[in-house]
Curated annotation (Swiss-Prot):
The active site is at 136. It comes from Karelsulcia muelleri (strain GWSS). Removes the formyl group from the N-terminal Met of newly synthesized proteins. Requires at least a dipeptide for an efficient rate of reaction. N-terminal L-methionine is a prerequisite for activity but the enzyme has broad specificity at other positions. GO terms for biological process: co-translational protein modification; translation. Its EC number is 3.5.1.88. Fe cation binds at residues 93, 135, 139. Gene3D superfamilies: Peptide deformylase. SUPFAM superfamilies: Peptide deformylase. This is Peptide deformylase. GO terms for molecular function: metal ion binding; peptide deformylase activity.
Length: 189
């Protein structure tokens, strides 16, 4: 089942999520629906807050250029350590459509989490997988990738989202304004 994705501007995306336990109902059904939603949206990761659930859960499926597939469920993850050099990569987000920005993140992380079978892991990830995990992890912490960009650019992006509807209205008004200018020139008003 395809679930609706919450879009930037909704305060729900800014909430820090809570942990769940084995008694959480229909976790596998939820995870399958999250994968369906992510595939439909052509994403490589999706977090629970993006679909309106304030729980510490995200999924990732990534195929690298070597055609190696990485598919993983992260329940109650905790990033223990971020280290190494800073890696700058382009990031986008299903909750912030049509915005792609260069973001600086650490190249290496150590993370503890449970999988969908409640098996506990403590793993090291680096490179692009580290970036993807940090991006999704930010969601369950109530953060967005645009929080990590240059402050002025951040303001412009936020204003852009708030003004999308206003731009549409301006477009409509511009047609009226052109009509007004023609009318004014003809009748010398």
């Amino acid at each position: 089942m395809i679930l609706p994705i919450i879009i930037y501007g909704n305060s729900f995306l800014r909430k820090k999520c809570i942990e769940i336990d084995k008694s959480y109902k229909d976790i596998n059904f939820l995870i399958n629906n999250m994968y369906d939603t992510m595939y439909q949206a052509k994403g490589i990761g999706l977090s629970a807050p993006q679909i309106g659930l304030s729980i510490r859960l995200f999924i990732i499926e990534y195929n690298n250029f070597l055609k190696q597939k990485f598919k993983k469920v992260f329940i109650n993850p905790i990033i223990i350590k971020k280290y190494g050099y800073n890696l700058i990569s382009k990031e986008g987000c299903l909750s912030i459509p049509n915005i792609i920005e260069n973001i600086k993140r650490k190249n290496n992380i150590i993370i503890e989490y449970y999988d969908e079978n409640w098996k506990k892991y403590k793993q090291h990830f680096n490179g692009l997988l580290s970036i993807i995990i940090q991006h999704e992890y930010d969601h369950i912490e109530g953060k967005l990738f645009i929080d990590n960009i240059f402050i002025l650019k951040n303001i412009l992006i936020k204003k852009n989202f708030n003004l999308n509807y206003n731009l549409y209205k301006l477009y409509k008004l511009s047609k009226l304004y052109k009509f007004y200018l023609i009318y004014r020139s003809r009748y010398r008003i």
